[in-house]
Amino acid sequence: MHIDLNSDLGESLGAWRMGDDAAMLGIVTSANVACGFHAGDAAGILATLRGAKERGVAVGAHVAYRDLAGFGRRNMDVASADLVADVIYQIGALQGLATAAGTRVTYVKPHGALYNTIARDARQARDVIAAIRAIDASLALVVLAGSPLERWAADAGLRVVAEAFADRAYTPQGTLVSRREPGAVLHDAGEVARRMLQLVREGTVRAIDGSTTRVRADSICVHGDSPGAVDMARAVRGALEREGIALRPFA
């Protein structure tokens, strides 16, 4: 039995620091590296890529809407031609930096509002899929587990990686509880570790109403930019390893 742990990295911008990339690279098996549209600068991104190379961590393009001011968390109605070009641009930029760092980009994980939108918006989903196919159809696409995007991407011939979130609550229907709702974000590292162990071993999680819901995931996202993020990620990894579950990248 095995699972991947991923985290969003390379998001520091100039004097503004975000997360502890060095620590997280010692925990995760895949790094979703910012591409400069929602966060990250070239020098910082390159440093993160070099760290990933040294640690044997897989690299993915964390593509986003063009939204530095909103950290990529604002919904945008982007024209198809623009969205396709923006995604191609971001992947290409990261591929260049990855080559310089001695590694390569093996997957794409959209960020923030783009991630949430394409999970259910067919038009923008098609645009992102088209962009990936245009630049490198071998790249895997990380998607929200159980979302329509799983089927859309698979039907388009992409390799699909279903993702669960370690620190997020789930509805009885297996979807994420909105961040606007109380209890949507979990902060107890021990609880989070136990939940992820259940997810990997049984394919289920305890929903916010106390029921059990099914979630099939190939990768678990452990956020690196929240308070206590490193300790939580370590707790998740430790719990899995103690139960003999191997941690390895999906790509």
From Swiss-Prot:
- Broadest EC class? hydrolase
Keyword hit for ATP-binding? yes
Question: Which is a Pfam family this sequence falls into?
Answer: LamB_YcsF
What keywords sit in the KW lines? Answer: ATP-binding, Hydrolase, Nucleotide-binding
Q: Does the keyword Cell inner membrane apply?
A: no
Which catalysed reactions does the entry list for this protein?
5-oxo-L-proline + ATP + 2 H2O = L-glutamate + ADP + phosphate + H(+)
Q: Which InterPro entries match?
A: Glyco_hydro/deAcase_b/a-brl (IPR011330), LamB/YcsF/PxpA-like (IPR005501)
Q: What CDD domains does the annotation carry?
A: LamB_YcsF_like
* Enzyme Commission number, as recorded: 3.5.2.9
- One GO-annotated biological process of the protein: carbohydrate metabolic process
A molecular function (GO) held by this record is:
ATP binding
Q: Which superkingdom?
A: Bacteria
Q: How does it assemble?
A: Forms a complex composed of PxpA, PxpB and PxpC.
* Family, per entry: Belongs to the LamB/PxpA family.
What does the UniProt record say this protein does? Catalyzes the cleavage of 5-oxoproline to form L-glutamate coupled to the hydrolysis of ATP to ADP and inorganic phosphate.
Q: Which HAMAP family match?
A: PxpA
Q: What is this protein called?
A: 5-oxoprolinase subunit A
